[in-house]
Amino acid sequence: MDTRDDVTLAKVPAPVAVYCGSVPRTSVGLRAPPPGGIDSSLLAHDEASLQPVSSVLPSSEKPSQLSREHEDQSSLMLNAPLKGWQARNGYPRGLGVLPLGHHLGAAIPSLESEASSVARDTIQIKDKLKKRRLSEGMAASSQASLDPVGGPRGVPLRSTIPRTTSQRLLRVPRPMPPIQSIPTTPEANSAKEKDLDPPGGRQDLQDPGASAQEVQISRQYLHCADEKMHKSLGGLVIPPIPKARMPTGTSSCRPGSLPSPLCPSQDVLMGPKAPHTRLTCENGPLEKTPKSPASKPLVPVVKAKSAEAPETSLASSQSTFTLTAFSSHAKETRSLENEEDQKESSTKVQVTISKSAQEKMRLKQMKEMELLRRAKEPEWERELVSQGLGTRRTSAKEGLLPLRGSGALSEPAGMSSPRRNNMGALQRKRANRASLPSIPVSKQEPGFARHASANSLPAVLTLGSPEWEEEEEEMDLRALRELRPFSNPELGLTDALQCLNSNDWQMKEKGLVNIQRLAACHSEVLGTRLHDVSLAVTAEVTNLRSKVSRLAISTLGDLFRVLKKNMDQEAEEIVRCLLQKMGNTSEFIQRAANRALGAMVENVTPARALVALTSAGVYHRNPLVRKCTAKHLSAVLEQIGAEKLLSGSRDNTDMLVHNLVRLAQDSNQDTRFYGRKMVNILMANAKFDAFLKQSLPSHDLRKVMAAIKQRGIQDNHELQSAKGRKVSKSLVVCENGLPSHEGVETSEQLRELTRLLEAKEFQARMEGVGKLLEYCKAKPELVAANLVQVFDVFTPRLHDSNKKVNQWALESLAQMLPILKESIHPMLLSLIIAAADNLNSKNSGISTAASTVLDAMMGSLDHLCLLQAFAGRVRFLTGPAVLDITDRLSVLVASVYPRKPQAVERHILPVLWYFLNKMSGNGVLPGRGGNVRTAVCRLARSLQEQMGSRLQDFAASQPQQVLKALQGLLASESLGANDKVIGGRMAPDIQMTGTTCPQQLD
């Protein structure tokens, strides 16, 4: 039984700085401190000087009580393992079993040599401080303070390092929140529960005040001025974190650990090892990992009972493994992170979408959810499965199918890891983008092109292709059938009208969808307020947002399909609005309007459709509108029939025939085809002859009838070429749904030609004109098939502001005309206007080139077409252009009259009457400039030669002034002298003799 006089010495660790906060995970490794950061004297003493000298306490004092004393004063709990920041960051907790530093080899022999005797334990202080070269006086004072018999007890020990150096090395930042202590192993948990003290070993401390004083005095070296430490180290020093005390449940060596150098009968309190110091410098985070000297017993201990042997501490042999283990573990973890990042970046496609695109995607998904909630969804899905890939793509485009890959960005399988589980912020960031669709890397569909964007058209089908139009129409019908009904349709109608009256385009879109649902499921409810609904929907056709406009057009088509003849009263206003949208440049708007007009023609009363189309589209200035009108009007005539049309009132029949003749003579090739087709339908009926007898047919009607009888087969070819032109305008689609090589090449050539002709630099425009001339010589069929598209861009170059481009375009046109010949007819009028305007140019080169163009027309094109075009243009010309065109009319009269006398009488005689009526006595036209008497005399003489006395008969019906002027011109003696020379130039008949003779032979 021990008494209070029996003094048992115990080793107590000196207080150290406790870091109570989180430590950033930075790279771990031994790095040199910055120059001048640490006193040079410290390097000589090595870093073992960082470990303070411990004081002596009686062995009777209980370690647990000492632990509580330390906890009260420095918040440091001994005998209980602390939770290191390694465990907080996913590192293994049992760090004591990892490899140790390189100082262990020097510490083990020293400990083995001194462990045989209790008295020699005091020499361990020298072994520990052997690199410091302690003075003999300091060693003597240390032995005196540690003598258990003599000398004062409880004398506070002072550090062997100078105060300034200690303060510089052990500077700590402001205290941070404490770190909770958690046992690192199950054995430590059990040891903590048992207080880790042997039974009977707990004794009260003899002088707790003295020990507290020692601890307090020793702590003064840890709290020093921040300025001094900052100056010495040049950065932030993160204080050491106390290591958890390892369990001592067994004395046997575990695998991977070194055996304890102490005897089993020795009970030693091990002091903490050298701190792990980090330096944060200006260039970046650097870490200094000093060499960790082996922990040694600080004071000799008295031999205890052999029963206490299993609890011998292994902290000295285990805690020194920590730094090496942490460094290697951090490197392995970082390499794993890099591998995972590389694997993730190689298997995932990062998608960046703008905010506007995200909003569009969100709205499209809302529409999908609205359309997908329907009663017969499984049946509809089975129907879609049976259809082809193109139909599914079309349905997905219109919002009837969910986007492929919509939802959260999927993470590849096998990518889960402990690091990924700890990255909560990154996962939340990815989760916030769940509304965006993932775009997978498609490697299994080489036969189809990717979509250009979320809202782009499928690359398989081209704009304007019949396949695309048919699938859009099928999609509209399917969507109409699958719309779900309202539980309260009256309330739904009211809500739809309110939405259409809103200023928000999204609300308008919702209202249009509700109208479609009402039309599909509650058509009787719409009938009560059909006029209001029709006006509201028609008003949205002209919406500036194309999405709303197209949806409104589709809604009108649905109303026509469902309500049929109930829409008769609204047809005229709707047709006018839809035809106006046909002039829109957006092809998808044109297709939607065309389908809606087709639904109107098929479902309303044919008479209503006939009136609506003729009143709104026949006289429209846009050629696309007239073409669409002629197409649908032809379908209406086929429904009504020629007999019923000719059986109506005379005024209505005359108006109808007049409109059809106007369409048959339209400048657009397709419009002319449909117009002639309708006239041919009327001509095939027997009542048409009776109509001709009752009403005097106009010259236009006779001309159209003659053209149909002579070139009826050519009209079919005209339509085919027009349709072929539309297909070649985009891309030629092969049977497999992919564009052919020829179609792609043609499209690229036309695109490049258009770019050059519309360029800002005049050199590029001249290059474009030259390229067009090359195409006409090498590939005339290419230019002829795309004539309207090409010459719409080329014609402005005939009026180009740059004189070089203007002259070069006229000269090139003169070379193109003999190559293209009759295929140039659709653009003839615009070319004649451009050439005639250039005749008045002050630039001699431009005026000469314009005259050359007119000569090429006279030699290459049909004189009948030229006669009509020249006669219509001459009244609007001034200056030299009037003289030139009038002279050419004189030549055309001699060529055309033998074949088409009616054409001359209809077109040339009005021109002659105009000149004779407006011309003054000296031959000057007021406001036109120049003397035209000679040119008019030339024209009158040519008509007199061809018509003879009939010219006088036609003149008798004109005013007396015109008749006298004509007689004066014909009787003039100077007329023969002016036949050869007109204004110093050779007469046109002599110039054009070679070109007009073949025409005269006809």
UniProtKB/Swiss-Prot annotation:
Q: Which GO terms describe its biological process?
A: negative regulation of cytoskeleton organization; negative regulation of supramolecular fiber organization
Per the UniProt entry, the disulfide pairs are none
Cellular compartments per GO CC = microtubule cytoskeleton
- Segments carrying the region annotation (Disordered) are 54-74, 131-214, 332-351, 402-421, 426-450
Which top-rank group of organisms is this from? Eukaryota
A Pfam match is CLASP_N
Q: What GO MF annotations does this protein's record show?
A: microtubule binding
The family annotation for this protein states: Belongs to the Crescerin family.
Protein name, as recorded: TOG array regulator of axonemal microtubules protein 2
Gene expressing this chain: Togaram2
